[in-house]
């Protein structure tokens, strides 16, 4: 028993459970002075925004202080990553502290947009001042977002899984109810349900293969015995981005939806804005095509976030390692980036077929939206499980060795 509680993995796991308790408790604290009986408060985007909020740690269904979730922070990370590729801006050359501060400023800007859009749409109880309630709820939602960011940082440093655990718990708590409600709304024949169950098993098998498949690049390491050279290699995943593209595309595409809601309150009589907002509504052809395109784009971007050729080549050069037949430095960087690009396209096509293809059914019936999102949800869920599993496995590695004496 003493050995179990002295384990680093167990200690970190218990700390993560404590943080999850705080998260679940906070997600049950509702915003004040709001009529909870009104469910369709965000117009036609309610179902999608509630679903996407659940994927990012939010809870629009119960209108809690965590309703917006980690979506502003995740969207800020995407934008920052895109901006950092521009050498003219020089964002990556600044100090880490300055970069973190600017990321938080960007998170604050997006949090203000989303929180204000939600607060203006909330059904306020008639006995209270609408302006004061909107202001107070906006501040509470922004504070809730930054509290979740802080909670994620705590879990990353002292627990297991970082922000992934919060997102995972939000999915487990909220998504099953969305799926059940969809089955109750859309009457699907039993045969189709059985077929979907079989396809789910096949998809899960393919997903496991894509996540565990590796392309091995032989690497020569200084001081390594010839007997072990066949075990020395650089691993590149068949789908380098994993389930991150789906997770971030849901967060990223929710920002325009919130922005259109906010602009609709500011310019209520603007015909052009109303027409554009209607065309970009969830389930419309424009939104579906943008969703599929961004999903493919993010599959490539996050592949390079996961495996950066410049960083790997620089690390190998400093440690005296090299890939057989490739010169160290820029040649190694170009070689690795070429492989990552090739596999990111393969992963992007897999993501588009599995997570983007079902979205085409939404063009025929918008009620199928949440069902069409399930394959992407499986990809995201699988990636999270594998990430946490690998982290726990790494923490327990030292405990597998027995003392010499």
Curated annotation (Swiss-Prot):
Membrane spanning residue stretches: 14-34, 63-83, 104-124, 131-151, 156-176, 191-211, 247-267, 285-305, 343-363, 368-388
Membrane topology according to the record: Multi-pass membrane protein
UniProt subcellular location: Cell membrane
HAMAP family: SecY2
Subunit structure: Component of the accessory SecA2/SecY2 protein translocase complex required to export cell wall proteins. May form heterotrimers with SecE and SecG subunits.
Similarity field: Belongs to the SecY/SEC61-alpha family. SecY2 subfamily.
PANTHER family per record: SECY/SEC61-ALPHA FAMILY MEMBER
Name of the protein this chain belongs to: Accessory Sec system protein translocase subunit SecY2
Organism listed in the record: Streptococcus mitis (strain B6)
Name of encoding gene: secY2
């Amino acid at each position: 028993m003493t050995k179990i509680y002295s384990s680093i993995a167990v200690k970190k796991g218990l700390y993560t459970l404590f943080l999850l308790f705080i998260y679940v408790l906070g997600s049950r604290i509702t915003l004040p002075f709001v009529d909870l009986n009104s469910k369709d408060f965000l117009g036609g985007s309610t179902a999608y925004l509630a679903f996407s909020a659940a994927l990012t740690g939010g809870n629009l269904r119960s209108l809690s202080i965590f309703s917006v979730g980690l979506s502003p922070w995740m969207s800020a990370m995407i934008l920052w990553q895109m901006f950092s590729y521009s050498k003219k801006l020089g964002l990556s050359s600044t100090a880490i502290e300055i970069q973190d501060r600017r990321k938080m400023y960007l998170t604050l800007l997006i949090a203000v947009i989303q929180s204000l859009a939600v607060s203006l749409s909330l059904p306020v109880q008639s006995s209270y001042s609408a302006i004061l309630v909107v202001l107070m709820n906006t501040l509470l939602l922004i504070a809730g977002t930054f509290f979740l960011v802080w909670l994620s940082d705590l879990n990353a440093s002292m627990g297991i899984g970082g922000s992934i655990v919060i997102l995972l718990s939000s999915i487990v708590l909220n998504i099953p109810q969305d799926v059940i409600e969809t089955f109750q709304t859309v009457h699907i024949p039993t045969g189709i349900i059985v077929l979907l169950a079989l396809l789910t098993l096949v998809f899960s098998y393919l997903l496991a293969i894509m996540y565990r498949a590796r392309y091995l690049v032989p690497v020569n390491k200084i001081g390594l015995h010839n007997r072990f050279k066949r075990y020395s290699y650089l691993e590149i995943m068949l789908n380098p981005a994993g389930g991150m593209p789906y997770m971030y595309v849901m967060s990223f595409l929710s920002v325009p939806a919130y922005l259109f809601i906010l602009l609709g309150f500011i310019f209520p009589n603007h015909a052009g804005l109303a027409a554009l907002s209607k065309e970009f509504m969830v389930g419309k052809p424009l939104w579906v095509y943008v969703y599929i395109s961004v999903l493919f784009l993010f599959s490539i971007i996050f592949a390079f976030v996961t495996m950066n050729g410049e960083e790997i080549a620089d690390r190998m050069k400093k440690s005296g390692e090299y890939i057989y037949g490739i010169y160290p430095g820029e040649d190694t960087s170009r070689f690795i980036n070429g492989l990552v690009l090739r596999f990111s396209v393969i992963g992007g096509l897999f993501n588009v077929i599995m997570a983007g293809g079902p979205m085409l059914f939404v063009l025929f019936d918008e009620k199928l939206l949440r069902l069409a999102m399930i394959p992407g949800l499986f990809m995201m869920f699988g990636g999270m499980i594998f990430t946490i599993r690998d982290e726990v496995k790494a923490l327990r590695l030292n405990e597998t060795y027995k003392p010499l004496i």
